[in-house]
């Protein structure tokens, strides 16, 4: 018995020592792996872009995905929101007055533009004066106009700016988050900021500064060492333009690009390579179809409603996005992350007979033919377009598909007299503050792609912007959502998730904070392992 016990002890000690050796080996291996994955300075990140070249790389005008993505690296915001909490950027505080009719913004000390000039309160005041100037045609103007009167902006000292509101607005803080200052010393004296040649080589305050742009090829940036949030880890970031998703995916697999948004249809194939990490997150984005009321036939509410009833939205979403993991059928033009979003609106459940009955009363001619525009590099939009074409054939409406490149789509959409199509597919991300959506819906706004005009509807938007009682405000935005649905000015299709493939040789993506459209809040945190 004693011999057996001793043997047992010896075996236990041996196993214990072996375990220690295994543990040491694991610790050594883990330490080596951790060391290899640790953030390093240097290296280059190449981001694949399939949404076309940028337009005006200026924060007062950026509205398309490409321009917004590039702008986020070049310019810095005053602050941002993360899970509902303020994260300070160029600013360090924003203090409301006791009556909420003014706000005092304080900038961080020692801020610099990428050309070495100081960034001060003068730049913030200049930025606001320009966006409020009707001659500059910035879509932000309406967001800082309450009851027909603009916000007044004044300099207190080199780091302090005062905003004076014509009336109390619950929307102000949520709208100010969208503002990225532009440099006064660069743009002073420029007549038309959107068309200014100064946008060709931007001077910003973000983590990376402009190096070179070759149309149709790439947009190259280099590290800005005096960035307010610390020197970026990468030496450079380059946005490489691909003619379509297939070409970009091939470049991704070959290591020619390191990161890109991917279509749901491509995820499994890329996963099977084992080369990439994937980030899937809600975009706060609505995929939609617009009815262009510049074209006479689309002024018929009955026709717009007939089209809505002819589409099986659940089936459309499943077909276009391949899985409900990547999108959910939409119930309102407001996204789920937006304040006061409600499902208490007409949902237009698929009803072919009702669609046919409405079409008969719509005044539309027999053998109606409609043109449906979409971005030709967007696989999901192409799938949507094909589905809608077949769906409307079921009520006797012929649909001609109009695939366009991204820039052509954007430029035609901004034409207030556009009659190039009756229907078009698109998507937007507007944030948590519902007042931000009014630039898409009010009668004379440049981004009112539906060209729907209704003074009573405009008045609801004005009322919602200044109402401070949350219950009353919720009711106003409920009325707004019901109006959009009843009038069927926009057909909400799906709330989408973003899927981003990242080369496993890069880290810091979590710290960089994945963000809809922009890809990341702060590219300075990404590093090469």
Show the residue positions of the predicted features.
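Alpha-helical secondary-structure segments
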Residues: 46, 120-126, 158-164, 206-207, ...
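N-terminal lobe/hinge region of extracytoplasmic solute-binding protein
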Residues: 48-98, 129, 203
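A structural "hinge/loop" feature
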Residues: 50-68, 90-92, 117, 172-181, ...
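Surface-exposed binding/hinge segments that line
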Residues: 95, 99, 142-188
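Gly/Pro-rich hinge or "lid" segments in bacterial periplasmic/extracellular proteins
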Residues: 177-232, 236, 357
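Ligand-site clamp/hinge motif
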Residues: 224-270
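Detector for C-terminal structural segments
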Residues: 311-338, 380-389, 414-529
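Structural transition elements
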Residues: 325-361, 378-381
């Amino acid at each position: 018995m004693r011999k057996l016990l001793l043997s047992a002890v010896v075996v236990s000690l041996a196993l214990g020592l072996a375990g220690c050796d295994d543990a040491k080996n694991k610790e050594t291996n883990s330490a080596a792996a951790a060391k290899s994955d640790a953030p390093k300075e240097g290296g280059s990140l190449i981001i694949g872009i399939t949404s076309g070249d940028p337009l005006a790389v200026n924060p007062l005008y950026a509205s398309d995905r490409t321009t917004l993505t590039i702008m986020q690296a070049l310019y810095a915001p005053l602050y941002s929101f993360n899970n509902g909490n303020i994260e300070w950027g160029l600013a360090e505080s924003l203090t409301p007055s006791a009556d909420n009719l003014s706000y005092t913004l304080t900038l961080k000390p020692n801020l610099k533009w990428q050309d070495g000039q100081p960034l001060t309160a003068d730049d913030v005041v200049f930025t606001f004066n320009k966006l409020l100037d009707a001659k500059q045609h910035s879509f932000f103007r309406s967001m800082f106009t309450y009851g027909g009167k603009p916000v007044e902006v004044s300099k207190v000292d080199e780091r302090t700016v005062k905003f004076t509101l014509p009336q109390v607005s619950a929307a102000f803080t949520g709208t100010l988050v969208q503002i990225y200052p532009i440099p006064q010393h660069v743009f002073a004296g420029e007549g038309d900021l959107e068309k200014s040649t100064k946008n060709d080589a931007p001077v910003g305050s973000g983590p990376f500064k402009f190096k070179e742009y070759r149309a149709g090829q790439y947009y190259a940036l280099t590290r800005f060492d005096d960035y307010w949030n610390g020197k970026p880890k990468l030496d450079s970031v380059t946005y490489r333009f691909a003619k379509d998703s297939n070409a970009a995916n091939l470049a991704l697999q070959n290591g020619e690009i390191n990161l890109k948004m991917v279509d749901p249809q491509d995820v499994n194939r890329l996963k099977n390579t084992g080369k990439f990490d994937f980030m899937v997150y809600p975009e706060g984005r609505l995929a939609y179809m617009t009815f262009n009321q510049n074209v006479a036939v689309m002024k018929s509410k009955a026709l717009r409603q007939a089209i809505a009833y002819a589409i099986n939205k659940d089936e459309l979403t499943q077909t276009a996005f391949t899985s409900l993991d990547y999108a959910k059928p939409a119930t309102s033009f407001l996204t789920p992350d937006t304040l006061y979003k409600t499902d208490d609106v007409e949902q237009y459940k698929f009803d072919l007979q009702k669609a046919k009955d409405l079409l008969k009363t719509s005044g539309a001619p027999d053998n109606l033919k409609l043109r449906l525009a979409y971005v030709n590099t967007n696989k999901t939009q192409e799938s949507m377009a094909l589905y809608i074409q077949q769906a409307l054939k079921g009520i006797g409406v012929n649909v001609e598909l109009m695939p366009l490149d991204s820039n052509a789509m954007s430029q035609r959409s901004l034409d207030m007299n556009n009659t190039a199509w009756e229907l078009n597919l698109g998507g937007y991300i507007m944030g948590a503050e519902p007042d931000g959506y009014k630039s898409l819906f009010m009668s004379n706004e440049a981004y009112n792609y539906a060209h729907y005009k209704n003074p009573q509807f405009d008045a609801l938007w004005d009322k919602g912007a200044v109402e401070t009682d949350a219950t009353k405000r919720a009711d106003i935005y409920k009325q707004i959502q019901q109006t959009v649905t009843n009038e069927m000015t926009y057909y909400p299709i799906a709330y989408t998730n973003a899927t981003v493939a990242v080369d496993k040789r890069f880290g810091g993506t979590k710290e960089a904070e994945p963000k809809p459209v922009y890809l990341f809040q702060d590219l300075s945190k990404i590093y090469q392992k």
